[in-house]
C-alpha cells in the first residue's frame, strides 16, 4: 500500500519554521578512546531542522532514524573519540535525510561518571557530572554545508555568600567590643573561627567551540568549573570530610558573578591555544537557600574579547 506524502504538501498557513524535530530521545552510545576502554554513555538527544514555508511538515521519523544509523553504523566504521564529533556526524546525516533543510542542529546531554576521593578520609566514591555537545550546520545555495561544534560540561559545587558573611562578621566585631575585647584580641578571634553565611548549590556550565584541527578536553572543562566555586561537593563524606568541605567553602566566599568571572579567566588561561574567534559560553546558576529564587550569571563571547578585557584589567 502506497501512502501519500502528507508532509510534502503545502501547509494552510505558509510560514517557515526555524526548528522542528524531536527532543528527549535517549540512546546508548559507545565512544572509542585511544589505548583505553570505550566510554559508555546514555545521552539525551535533541535534533532539529528548519522547515520551508512551502512544506507542511518534516519527515519526523527520519530524525530518530539518523541517530540510530550514526550510533549503530558510523561509530563502528569510524574512529570517533568525542561527543562533539558524534554531533557533527549526526548533523551531516540530518541534511541527507531532510533534503529540504538549510539548517540542522543537535544538542546532546549525558551524565558522566567520575571517580573521586573525599578530601580528608580519601574514601572512594562516584560523582556525576554532565557533558554537553552541540553541532549546528548551515547549507548555502550551492549545497555547501558549514558545521560548527561545541563541547562542554555542567558541574555542581557549593558557594558561600560574601555579603551575609560580612554582615555577620561586623555583628561579631560589635558584640566582642561590647564585651570588652580589644581590637587586637578581636582580630585573633576572627582569624581563629569560621564566620557563618548562607550557602547555595552552584551549577556551573562551560561550553567551548571546537574549531577544526583543535581539541578541547572535557576533563579540563570539568576541572575549571569545580575550581571556580567556593568548594566542591562529594557524594560520600565522613565527619572530618564534611567539616573540611564546609570550612573551605566559607573561607572562599563567592557571588554568582564571581564564579562566572573565575570560569572565564580559567578558560582563557587553559585554552590559550584556541583561535581568537573561538566561541565561549559560561553560565553559573546558584540555587538559593534563603530565597525562593535562583541567582544567575552568564557570558557569551569569543576568546579574543575575553582575553582583551582581562588584559585591560591587568594593565
UniProtKB/Swiss-Prot annotation:
InterPro entries in alphabetical order: GTP_cyclohydrolase_FolE2/MptA, GTP_cyclohydrolase_MptA
Enzyme Commission identifier(s): 3.5.4.39
Gene3D superfamilies in alphabetical order: Urate Oxidase
UniProt KW keywords: Hydrolase, Iron, Metal-binding
Broadest EC class assigned to this enzyme: hydrolase
GO biological process: tetrahydromethanopterin biosynthetic process
Name of this protein: GTP cyclohydrolase MptA
Organism: Methanococcus maripaludis (strain C5 / ATCC BAA-1333)
Amino acid at each position: 500500500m502506497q501512502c501519500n506524502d502528507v508532509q510534502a504538501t503545502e501547509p494552510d498557513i505558509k510560514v517557515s519554521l526555524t526548528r522542528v524535530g524531536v527532543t528527549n530521545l535517549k540512546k546508548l552510545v559507545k565512544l572509542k578512546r585511544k589505548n583505553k576502554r570505550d566510554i559508555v554513555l546514555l545521552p539525551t538527544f535533541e535534533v532539529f531542522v528548519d522547515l520551508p514555508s512551502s512544506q507542511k511538515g518534516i519527515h519526523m521519523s527520519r530524525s530518530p532514524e539518523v541517530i540510530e544509523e550514526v550510533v549503530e553504523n558510523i561509530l563502528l566504521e569510524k574512529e570517533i573519540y568525542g561527543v562533539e564529533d558524534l554531533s557533527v556526524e549526526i548533523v551531516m546525516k540530518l541534511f541527507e535525510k531532510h533534503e529540504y533543510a538549510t539548517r540542522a542542529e543537535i544538542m546532546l546531554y549525558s551524565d558522566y561518571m567520575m571517580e573521586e576521593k573525599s578530601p580528608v578520609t580519601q574514601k572512594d566514591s562516584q560523582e556525576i557530572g554532565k557533558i554537553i555537545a552541540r553541532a549546528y550546520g548551515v547549507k548555502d545555495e550551492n549545497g555547501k554545508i558549514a558545521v560548527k561544534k561545541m563541547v562542554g560540561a555542567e558541574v555542581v559545587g557549593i558557594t558561600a555568600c560574601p555579603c551575609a558573611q560580612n554582615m555577620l562578621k561586623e555583628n561579631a566585631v560589635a558584640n566582642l567590643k561590647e564585651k570588652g575585647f580589644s581590637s587586637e584580641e578581636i582580630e585573633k578571634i576572627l582569624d581563629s573561627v569560621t564566620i557563618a553565611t548562607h550557602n547555595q548549590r552552584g551549577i556551573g556550565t562551560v561550553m567551548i567551540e571546537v574549531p577544526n584541527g583543535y581539541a578541547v578536553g572535557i576533563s579540563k572543562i570539568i576541572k575549571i568549573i569545580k575550581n571556580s566555586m567556593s568548594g566542591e561537593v562529594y557524594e560520600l563524606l565522613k565527619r572530618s570530610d564534611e567539616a573540611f568541605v564546609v570550612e573551605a567553602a566559607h573561607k572562599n566566599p563567592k557571588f554568582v558573578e564571581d564564579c562566572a568571572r573565575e570560569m572565564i579567566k580559567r578558560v582563557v588561561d587553559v585554552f590559550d591555544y584556541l583561535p581568537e574567534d573561538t566561541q565561549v559560553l559560561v553560565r553559573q546558576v546558584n540555587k538559593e537557600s534563603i530565597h525562593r529564587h535562583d541567582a544567575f550569571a552568564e557570558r557569551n563571547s569569543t576568546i579574543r574579547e575575553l582575553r582583551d578585557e582581562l588584559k585591560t584589567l591587568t594593565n
